Protein backbone atom coordinates (compact mmCIF):
# COMPACT_ATOMS: atom_id res chain seq x y z
CA UNK A 1 0.00 0.00 0.00
CA UNK A 2 1.19 3.50 -0.82
CA UNK A 3 2.09 5.90 1.98
CA UNK A 4 -0.27 8.72 1.03
CA UNK A 5 1.41 11.28 3.29
CA UNK A 6 4.66 10.99 1.30
CA UNK A 7 3.05 11.58 -2.10
CA UNK A 8 3.51 14.87 -3.91
CA UNK A 9 0.40 16.80 -4.92
CA UNK A 10 0.83 15.59 -8.50
CA UNK A 11 1.23 11.94 -7.43
CA UNK A 12 -1.80 12.16 -5.13
CA UNK A 13 -3.84 13.63 -7.98
CA UNK A 14 -2.59 10.94 -10.39
CA UNK A 15 -3.45 8.07 -8.01
CA UNK A 16 -6.95 9.45 -7.38
CA UNK A 17 -7.60 9.83 -11.12
CA UNK A 18 -6.35 6.29 -11.80
CA UNK A 19 -8.90 4.98 -9.27
CA UNK A 20 -11.77 6.86 -10.94
CA UNK A 21 -12.01 9.87 -8.62
CA UNK A 22 -11.65 13.37 -10.05
CA UNK A 23 -10.23 15.65 -7.37
CA UNK A 24 -10.25 19.40 -7.34
CA UNK A 25 -7.11 21.39 -6.66
CA UNK A 26 -4.91 19.87 -3.99
CA UNK A 27 -4.22 22.62 -1.47
CA UNK A 28 -3.05 22.54 2.15
CA UNK A 29 -6.72 22.84 3.17
CA UNK A 30 -7.90 19.95 0.94
CA UNK A 31 -4.92 17.60 1.02
CA UNK A 32 -6.01 15.73 4.15
CA UNK A 33 -9.43 15.05 2.62
CA UNK A 34 -7.88 13.72 -0.59
CA UNK A 35 -5.41 11.56 1.35
CA UNK A 36 -8.33 10.03 3.24
CA UNK A 37 -10.23 9.49 -0.02
CA UNK A 38 -7.23 7.75 -1.59
CA UNK A 39 -6.95 5.40 1.40
CA UNK A 40 -10.66 4.57 1.06
CA UNK A 41 -10.32 3.90 -2.66
CA UNK A 42 -7.25 1.71 -2.17
CA UNK A 43 -8.98 -0.31 0.57
CA UNK A 44 -12.21 -0.87 -1.36
CA UNK A 45 -12.53 -3.34 -4.23
CA UNK A 46 -12.11 -1.84 -7.70
CA UNK A 47 -15.25 -0.18 -9.00
CA UNK A 48 -16.28 -0.60 -12.60
CA UNK A 49 -18.86 1.72 -14.14
CA UNK A 50 -21.99 -0.08 -15.32
CA UNK A 51 -21.98 -0.98 -18.99
CA UNK A 52 -24.87 0.56 -20.87
CA UNK A 53 -26.26 -1.97 -23.31
CA UNK A 54 -28.10 -0.75 -26.35
CA UNK A 55 -31.65 -2.11 -26.46
CA UNK A 56 -32.23 -4.52 -29.28
CA UNK A 57 -35.26 -4.40 -31.50
CA UNK A 58 -36.96 -7.72 -32.18
CA UNK A 59 -37.88 -6.54 -35.68
CA UNK A 60 -36.23 -4.10 -38.05
CA UNK A 61 -32.76 -2.65 -38.36
CA UNK A 62 -30.79 -1.50 -35.34
CA UNK A 63 -29.14 1.22 -37.38
CA UNK A 64 -32.43 3.04 -37.95
CA UNK A 65 -32.76 6.65 -36.84
CA UNK A 66 -36.36 6.04 -35.77
CA UNK A 67 -35.76 6.87 -32.12
CA UNK A 68 -39.45 7.56 -31.42
CA UNK A 69 -40.44 4.16 -32.77
CA UNK A 70 -37.67 2.57 -30.72
CA UNK A 71 -39.01 4.27 -27.58
CA UNK A 72 -42.53 3.09 -28.34
CA UNK A 73 -41.25 -0.45 -28.83
CA UNK A 74 -39.47 -0.31 -25.47
CA UNK A 75 -42.52 1.06 -23.66
CA UNK A 76 -44.81 -1.53 -25.25
CA UNK A 77 -42.36 -4.28 -24.35
CA UNK A 78 -42.26 -3.16 -20.72
CA UNK A 79 -45.87 -2.41 -19.96
CA UNK A 80 -47.99 -4.12 -22.56
CA UNK A 81 -50.03 -1.95 -24.86
CA UNK A 82 -48.93 1.58 -23.93
CA UNK A 83 -48.39 4.07 -26.72
CA UNK A 84 -46.86 7.51 -26.61
CA UNK A 85 -48.64 10.37 -28.33
CA UNK A 86 -47.39 13.84 -29.07
CA UNK A 87 -49.63 16.49 -27.57
CA UNK A 88 -49.92 20.13 -28.40
CA UNK A 89 -50.84 22.97 -26.10
CA UNK A 90 -54.50 23.84 -26.33
CA UNK A 91 -54.21 27.57 -26.92
CA UNK A 92 -57.96 28.10 -26.71
CA UNK A 93 -57.89 27.62 -22.95
CA UNK A 94 -54.97 29.97 -22.29
CA UNK A 95 -56.18 33.50 -21.46
CA UNK A 96 -52.75 34.83 -22.47
CA UNK A 97 -53.03 33.37 -25.97
CA UNK A 98 -53.01 35.59 -29.02
CA UNK A 99 -56.44 37.06 -29.92
CA UNK A 100 -56.94 34.85 -32.98
CA UNK A 101 -56.47 31.66 -30.91
CA UNK A 102 -58.71 32.52 -27.96
CA UNK A 103 -62.11 31.02 -27.33
CA UNK A 104 -64.71 32.80 -29.49
CA UNK A 105 -66.93 35.22 -27.63
CA UNK A 106 -64.34 36.30 -25.05
CA UNK A 107 -62.85 39.75 -24.99
CA UNK A 108 -59.78 41.04 -23.27
CA UNK A 109 -58.92 44.61 -22.55
CA UNK A 110 -55.45 45.90 -23.30
CA UNK A 111 -54.84 46.37 -19.57
CA UNK A 112 -55.72 42.72 -18.91
CA UNK A 113 -53.30 41.59 -21.59
CA UNK A 114 -50.51 43.80 -20.26
CA UNK A 115 -51.13 42.43 -16.78
CA UNK A 116 -51.06 38.86 -18.07
CA UNK A 117 -47.80 39.34 -19.94
CA UNK A 118 -45.98 41.73 -17.61
CA UNK A 119 -47.27 40.44 -14.29
CA UNK A 120 -48.57 43.82 -13.16
CA UNK A 121 -50.86 46.55 -14.37
CA UNK A 122 -49.09 49.51 -15.97
CA UNK A 123 -49.08 52.84 -14.22
CA UNK A 124 -51.34 55.41 -15.73
CA UNK A 125 -50.06 58.93 -15.91
CA UNK A 126 -52.27 61.88 -16.46
CA UNK A 127 -50.94 64.42 -18.85
CA UNK A 128 -51.55 67.96 -17.63
CA UNK A 129 -53.57 70.22 -19.86
From Swiss-Prot:
Biased composition (Basic and acidic residues): 83-97
Signal peptide coordinates: none
Stretches assigned to the LEM domain: 1-45
InterPro entries for this protein: LEM/LEM-like_dom_sf, LEM_dom, LEM_domain
Superkingdom of source: Eukaryota
Location of the region described as Disordered in the Swiss-Prot/TrEMBL record: 45-129
Protein name: LEM domain-containing protein 1
Organism: Mus musculus
Gene: Lemd1
Amino acid sequence: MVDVKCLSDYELHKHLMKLGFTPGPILPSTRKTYEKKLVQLLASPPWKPPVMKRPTRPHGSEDSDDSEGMLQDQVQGLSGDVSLKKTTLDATRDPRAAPHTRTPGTTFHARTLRTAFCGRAPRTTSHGA
